[in-house]
A protein has these predicted regions:
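Non-catalytic accessory segments flanking enzyme active sites
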Residues: 2-47
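Rieske [2Fe-2S] iron-sulfur-binding domain
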Residues: 31-135
Length: 141
């Protein structure tokens, strides 16, 4: 009985505390080149943080919009201009836009704009990169 109560309390803490706070990712120097990425898991939520050619750093849910497969499995690395889903090869630019979706060209109602990666809020403070899954969280600064 105690274990069940502890598990329930922990699940509530995850929802009420950890899903609503800022999470440290690393220093902006870890994103030296376009295509550099870091994967940060917050319990069951996986986030991929990327550096785009424009120099900006973005955060996305690490989930393909096609079938929900995890996009990036390595903790960190570098890609050549896009994130590619290993399941059906949907490709996303480093700014989250869907660039390629094989075998969708014959679908009249399919729009790449409707299938961009879902953003995760990211802020950089004094060179340190933070993410939050709460769109209403107070600014990190």
């Amino acid at each position: 009985m105690v274990k069940a109560e502890q598990k329930k309390a922990f699940e509530q803490e995850k929802i009420n505390i950890f899903m609503n706070c800022w999470h440290f990712v690393g220093h902006s120097n870890e994103f030296k080149e376009p295509g550099s990425y870091v994967v940060q898991d917050v319990f069951e939520q996986s986030v991929v943080i990327t550096k785009e050619k424009d120099g900006n750093i973005y955060a996305w849910h690490n989930v393909c919009r096609h079938r929900g497969n995890r996009l990036m499995n390595e903790r960190r690395g570098k890609v050549n201009g896009m994130l590619r889903c290993p399941y059906h090869s949907w490709c996303y630019s480093l700014n989250g836009d869907l660039r390629a979706a094989p075998r969708t060209e014959h679908l009249d109602s399919f729009s790449k704009k409707d299938h961009s990666l879902r953003t995760v809020r990211l802020e950089i403070f004094a060179g340190w990169v933070f993410i939050t899954l709460d769109d209403n969280a107070l600014p990190i600064s």
